[in-house]
Amino acid sequence: MRLGCSGRRRRLLRAALLRLVVLVLVAPPRRCAGESATCLAVYREGGAPAVFQSAHCPRWTLLAPSAGSGGEGDGDRRSSSSSPPPPPHPRGCHVAVDRGRRRSQEDRAVCALGIRIPFIGIYHKIKEVDVGVVAVFDGHNGAEASEMASKLLLEYFLLHVYFLLDGIYSIMFRKSTGKLTYKEVTILNNVINLYKEDQSSHSKGSCWALPAILDRSFHMEVLKESLLRAVHDVDLTFSKEALRNNFESGSTAAVILIVDGQIIAANVGDSKAFLCSESHDSSIDKKTSVVSGKRRRKRNSNNRDDFALANYDGPFYNVKELTKDHHPDREDERSRVEAAGGYVLEWAGVHRVNGELALSRAIGDVPYKRYGVIPTPELTEWQSLSANDTFLIASSDGVFEKMTMQDVCDLMLRVKLGVNQELGSFAVTQRNLADYVVDLALEKGTTDNVAAVIVPLGSHYSSKVTLEDWYMLEENSKTSISPLQTIPYQQKSGRFNVQ
């Protein structure tokens, strides 16, 4: 299985995973694994970075550029006449990234929807799970960390899904390799406990019926663990690169998985992820907030529009926050920093680690790791999307320099209602929603880079794409992963924007 970027590409990783689960279901007990024993050992020892670099895993090749190879660090993402045009962005993703008043662009964004991942379900049936990945990376002290994170996150995530399933299926079907050695017991305690209980009652080396763990919760835990490992490995890869090249940059990471109507958020730093959810709160305060927001956006507001909003009896949007900022003035974050020998000092009105770094968790920032700055994400639990959840939004902190999350949700309502004269008629499928957020942040005077990803939710807005849009299987049937085009763009005054 070779993942490449040639024109003859067809359903790559999905085909690889399908082959794996079919092999597990039909192969003899000692031949259940899809990878060689040596490659599995490489994975267990060093994770995704080791697999992509090892000669023992020739089927896996990462073609993404290193952090020091250039890219969008200058803030103007220009297309080259010698390079093929970027692939179309998945429908349903609204992405905008703007340099703002900064000299360089250090923000990055990723949005991939409709990734179909096959799992073995109960009764030996193959179940394809629809997965979406939304992420924002806010770089600082350079774009190297955010650039590498945006290039590697999805590749690492999907590789971990593949290898975790390979290892788990091998154990469940009593493959001769015995037990997992790469922290597999951390996937889920109740899953592993079921393994131990069932292993004690079955003869060694025999395949046995799939246990009850292969219900809808099994794949959710595999995906969650894959996300955690992907973020860990992105930091590991970048930190090694930073030491080699004397990079001092770091990055936030706000990542959301969307899986079969449920979401989970992993956060490192102070980028934000949240939902705008419909509420039939018709209070005067809510109406005043929306109307005044409109007036702030355009001083010469149309009185008719104000009247329409003031008399609007439909649902408003409330914020459902999915992430918490990692600043060193947070009590638990400060305690960790101080326990590691660092200190927190307020400078220019901002609490900073050792008086310098304004974050207590980050990808990269290698000089501060010894002082308690960690890349470990703070993770929510899986939560079901309700019928009222209308927009999923991830943004860098540049958006919130002059705005609040509620301001963003109020803006989405005004856009949806189409009452702003300058917005014209509104159609989700024809206009980039993220542009509205970025434009308003800049209009309000933010000086930072700005990035926003918006995914409209609900059946009215849903538009699925298949894994074929991202991964294709080449004819030579070997495996390598090519970099995904994370922000297909049209240049617009230093901005990347796409719908």
From Swiss-Prot:
GO molecular function: metal ion binding; protein serine/threonine phosphatase activity
All copies of domain PPM-type phosphatase, residue ranges: 92-457
SUPFAM superfamilies linked: PP2C-like
Keywords on record: Hydrolase, Magnesium, Manganese, Metal-binding, Protein phosphatase, Signal
Pfam families found in the cross-reference section: PP2C (PF00481)
Key word Zinc present: no
PROSITE patterns assigned to the protein according to its UniProt record, in alphabetical order: PPM_2
Keyword Manganese: yes
Textual note on the cofactor: Binds 2 magnesium or manganese ions per subunit.
PANTHER family in alphabetical order: PROTEIN PHOSPHATASE
Similarity annotation: Belongs to the PP2C family.
Protein's UniProt name: Putative protein phosphatase 2C 76
Organism whose genome encodes this protein: Oryza sativa subsp. japonica
